[in-house]
Design a protein with these regions (language model features):
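Long, contiguous binding/interaction regions
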Residues: 1-117
Length: 117
């Protein structure tokens, strides 16, 4: 079984447009992971459904979203922090009239083998 890595993402200097986009990203807890990722990466589930894509674009074997709102994002991923996901989320939010966006991420492994900010 994979070690679970919890990530907590917060923002400052985020535009109203980006806040609204985040609030609509995961309308409820039944929202599929591929639906959330599809909005961030502008991809279909078929385009994202392979190990190579996950490795090159998310940085972990899988990811789940525990909470998504303009107040922050919390995720759980397998084996490692999804650093490439963080980068792509930042790029997406910056493109939504948030040129001064600041994003903080903290993560920890359940063992704990590692932690980071």
């Amino acid at each position: 079984m994979a070690n679970h890595v919890s990530s907590y993402i917060s923002f400052s200097d985020i535009s109203e447009e980006a806040e609204n986009w985040l609030d609509k990203l995961m309308p409820d807890y039944n929202t599929a992971v591929y639906e959330v990722l599809g909005k961030i990466y502008d991809k279909t589930e078929a385009e994202m459904d392979n190990w190579e894509w996950w490795n090159e674009n998310v940085g972990s074997k899988w990811i789940t979203f525990e909470d998504v709102s303009c107040d922050g994002v919390s995720t759980i991923s397998a084996w490692s922090p999804p650093t490439l996901f963080y980068e792509n989320l930042y790029k997406k939010l910056s493109s939504l009239n948030s040129p001064d966006l600041k994003m903080w991420v903290s993560y920890d492994d359940e063992m704990p083998n590692f932690v980071g900010v």
